[in-house]
Amino acid sequence: MSKYMDYTSPEAQFFFDVNKNPLFKKDNQNLINILGVNQLNTLDNSSLLDIYLSKHNFVEPHYHQNAAELVYCISGGAVVSMLNPYTKEVLNFRISPGQVANVPQGWWHYEEATKDQTHLLAIFNASTPEVILGSDILKFTPSSVMAYNYCMDESEWIKTTEKVKPSTYIGPGCLEPERHLSQRQSHFTYSPYHYQYQPNPCYYRQCIPKTF
């Protein structure tokens, strides 16, 4: 929905330096800057994330409950993965400079850099994108609820998730010895996998939104 904007007002903003508005910084090679209506008030249902990643770093699994996301590769390379809730299929798209992958609103997705110095631009059809992060789901859902619903040992679940950092944004969130990084091979194979499923998937709207 378009908003009213008085373009004659001295408060109307037409320029902003996205480099000066970090959302998250893991290190100098892995960081996210943000532009939304809170930074540039003449934006009309558009916003973006300026994403820098080194090889094998991820934008962690997450979804945007209020916007679709168009991921454009500026440099380097990445795999954009998303779960299609209708087919229960994980779709993987390798993108290189000049290529895009589109993530529909509300779809669970993540990105992995396949090269160092990867630069991605994530464009949203919302003035400020909202996000639900996988790390927050893992960390803040009561362990008793997870254990009971999924028939797990609660103590094992607690142990497994104890190192999960809330709002990880860029993973892995654990520290790796520097000497291992250059030798590390990806542990992930990007071919779609399938589940047997029932039609008419359920959608849950009772969530706590995070606004960037």
Show the residue positions of the predicted features.
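Glycine- and acidic-residue-biased ligand/ion/polar-headgroup-sensing regions
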Residues: 66-84
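Conserved hydrophobic/aromatic beta-strand scaffold that supports enzyme active sites
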Residues: 48-52, 70, 92, 100-102, ...
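Short acidic-glycine-tyrosine-enriched beta hairpin
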Residues: 85-105
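A short, N-terminal "cap"/entry segment at the start of jelly-roll beta-barrel domains
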Residues: 1-46, 154-212
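Short glycine/proline-enriched turns and hinge-like loops at secondary-structure junctions
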Residues: 63-65, 72-73, 113-116
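Ligand-binding loop in jelly-roll beta-barrel domains
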Residues: 94-96, 105-132
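Conserved short histidine dyad/triad with adjacent acidic residue
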Residues: 49-66, 94-97
